[in-house]
């Protein structure tokens, strides 16, 4: 069964996470939270000035982005504690707004029903910072619920220095 993921913030990082996750059968993106409407988000997903055209059928159905027939709920909520993560069965939230990089603020996603939060930036007060290829073996599912994946610079350089 696929892990249910929600993306909070559908900018450059959020859309790239979606592109990668969509092609992974072990991941199901069930929702996107962003202040922009579904039609604009669908267009930005389909046509990326850096990565090119997303090679899947992308359309809109009300408040949903539809990719290859799969509906992804679009929400526009500024308070993460009010998001319907529990109702949607969200296990992991990718926090990519840049606004909730403190553990205490990111914890609102857990209040909303998510099991884990991955912050796509350096964070303060997170349970652990993980850099793949460097320290991912330190992850403990029972203890670590708010995870930072450090900065893009750290992710580029740290594996070489390890």
Residue ranges and their predicted role:
Residues 1-162:
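N-terminal Rossmann-like NAD(P) cofactor-binding subdomain of oxidoreductases
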């Amino acid at each position: 069964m696929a892990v249910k993921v929600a993306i909070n913030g559908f900018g450059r990082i959020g859309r790239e996470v979606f592109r990668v996750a969509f092609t992974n059968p072990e991941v199901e993106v069930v929702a996107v939270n962003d202040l922009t409407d579904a039609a604009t988000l669908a267009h930005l997903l389909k046509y990326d000035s850096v990565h090119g055209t997303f090679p899947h059928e992308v359309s809109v159905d009300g408040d949903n982005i539809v990719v290859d027939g799969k509906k992804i709920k679009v929400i526009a909520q500024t308070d993460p504690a009010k998001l319907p993560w529990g109702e949607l069965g969200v296990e992991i939230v990718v926090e990519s707004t840049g606004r909730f990089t403190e553990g205490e603020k990111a914890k609102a996603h857990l209040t909303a029903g998510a099991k884990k939060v991955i912050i796509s930036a350096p964070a303060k007060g997170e349970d652990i910072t993980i850099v793949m290829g460097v320290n991912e073996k330190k992850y403990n599912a029972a203890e670590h619920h708010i995870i930072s994946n450090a900065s893009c610079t750290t992710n580029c350089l740290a594996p070489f220095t390890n």
